[in-house]
């Protein structure tokens, strides 16, 4: 009997539950009448930032400063014809932008055209710097690193160049050093204009 009572109670309970949810009437659709297009609001523009102007790069006539020094160096008595020369990157101690790469390239071109020495080719120089763990752009600040690089390249001489002074009074200094002895064979200075 308990089973029967339980079945009847379950039937009444289930019969009382609605099987479908009550439906709501659909929302009324209102027709939209076209209106004249209005001008959209203009976006607010951010304030204009003033970009600072970069420092002016002054054009330096490197040939005028370097060629007289290379001519002076080429008549040094201790230089042997056809020997190999490592040209170190020009070191900038002037505090300004002097385009040291252009100066280095001018030195290499001047040595190749004026002097009886031969410069180490650029590709060979870069591969040697990479093999020794030196950066390609850096000047070889330590003489020992420069001499090590020159010995690795089997060069006979190394030429160091430095630009000192302020904007209106810059001077380029060069020193030619023997790789074998470490002796400074020649040094010279010239005003950079």
Curated annotation (Swiss-Prot):
Q: Which UniProt keywords apply?
A: Cell outer membrane, Cell shape, Lipoprotein, Membrane, Palmitate, Peptidoglycan synthesis, Signal
Gene Ontology biological-process annotations: peptidoglycan biosynthetic process; regulation of cell shape
What ranges does the record list as Pro residues composition bias?
A: 37-46
Query: GO CC terms on record?
Result: periplasmic side of cell outer membrane
Identify the main location. Answer: membrane
Subcellular localization, per the record?
A: Cell outer membrane
Q: At which residues is a lipid of type S-diacylglycerol cysteine covalently attached?
A: 17
Give the way it sits in the membrane: Lipid-anchor
Q: What does this protein do?
A: Regulator of peptidoglycan synthesis that is essential for the function of penicillin-binding protein 1B (PBP1b).
HAMAP family cross-referenced by the UniProt entry: LpoB (MF_01889)
Subunit structure, interactors included: Interacts with PBP1b.
Q: What is this protein called?
A: Penicillin-binding protein activator LpoB
């Amino acid at each position: 009997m308990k089973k029967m009572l339980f079945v009847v109670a379950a039937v009444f309970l289930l019969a009382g539950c609605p099987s479908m949810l009550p439906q709501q009437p659909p929302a009324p659709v209102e027709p939209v009448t076209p209106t004249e297009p209005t001008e959209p609001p203009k976006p607010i523009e951010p304030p204009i930032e003033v970009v600072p102007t970069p420092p002016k790069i002054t054009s330096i006539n490197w040939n005028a400063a370097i060629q007289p020094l290379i001519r002076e160096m080429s008549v040094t008595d201790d230089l042997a014809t056809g020997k190999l020369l490592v040209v170190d990157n020009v070191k900038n101690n002037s505090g300004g932008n002097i385009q040291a790469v252009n100066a280095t390239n001018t030195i290499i071109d001047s040595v190749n055209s004026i002097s009886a020495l031969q410069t180490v080719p650029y590709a060979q120089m870069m591969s040697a710097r990479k093999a020794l763990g030196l950066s390609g752009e850096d000047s070889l600040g330590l003489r020992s690193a420069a001499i090590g690089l020159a010995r690795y390249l089997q060069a006979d001489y190394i030429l160091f160049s430095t630009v000192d002074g302020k904007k209106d009074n810059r001077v380029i200094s060069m020193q030619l050093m023997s790789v074998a002895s470490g002796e400074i064979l020649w040094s010279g200075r010239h005003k950079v204009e």
